[in-house]
């Protein structure tokens, strides 16, 4: 598989809406400095020794309290495990529970870099349809029967790239179908807490006592991605299998220092207010992007107004290949992520993903204006 180039929003000549990363205004640097100073002032030899493989109580206990309060559903530390973020968690799950040649059910469209993680483990991708928060359960059932998948990978909340959230009925169907078939349900919940109405959905792992659900969370989108701190929520049986991986047993806590820093912020009760600030900033940017899209692409594209997360999924109404158009668009100083990159079969060629996280409202206004002008010229 060809490696996708890592991009940042630091090119002064390009407003790159392909970049799904926070800008500096979304990273609470003062809170991180204060937490770092606190950790430094209270540093002990235990802080920099091998940590518990599942993570230290100083991280897991306040994390459980934060998750319980934010989602209004009880979460206990015993069902949590420290990770280096959702990508590293997904890699761990593949290592622990799959073998080369196994099938993985994935949404179409889905997070394109997850494809590379699955490929690293020699897994076969089997796409199933997702649209406007719904799934075709009959078709999915047939795929499960035919392919006997080891995993089903979903991004239920404010999907990357679609931006939608699965309905309660769709989530219940996924949980039920995976339980009956013995398929592990892997729920990537990186955007779960970025609801613009400040009402976070409960994790999929919190909705069932079934042993087949793993929810993956991260502080990359709600604090800072460079910390590389996240968690897996699952039952004790699955957690023990993950903790039994050789490199976990050998190295102990996956990110001891980072987890203590985040734990300090959680323990001080600061994460809730930091999250609220992030939600408010993102909502303002999403609103401006929606308004600018209406003004500049309203006659040539369709999309849904975002209600959370990082992304807007835009589909051109005329036959056009957004992959082929991208180099021409970038020459004019604006970029996007082509829709086909989010499909294991190359579908969604008329669509594109736009991120409103990496730029302020002025840049978003400027970039969407430029995007609309350029696309109208190219496709007409």
Identify the meaning behind each predicted range.
Residues 263, 280-290, 302-315:
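Conserved glycine-rich beta-strand-loop-beta hairpin in the small C-terminal domain of fold type I
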Residues 46-182, 192-210, 282, 362, ...:
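Conserved core of the PLP fold type I
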Residues 206-280:
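Conserved core segment of the aminotransferase class I/II
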Residues 234, 313-319, 336-374:
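Conserved PLP-binding active-site segment of the aspartate aminotransferase-like
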Residues 1-85, 92, 267, 335, ...:
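N-terminal small-domain helix-loop-helix segment of the aminotransferase-like
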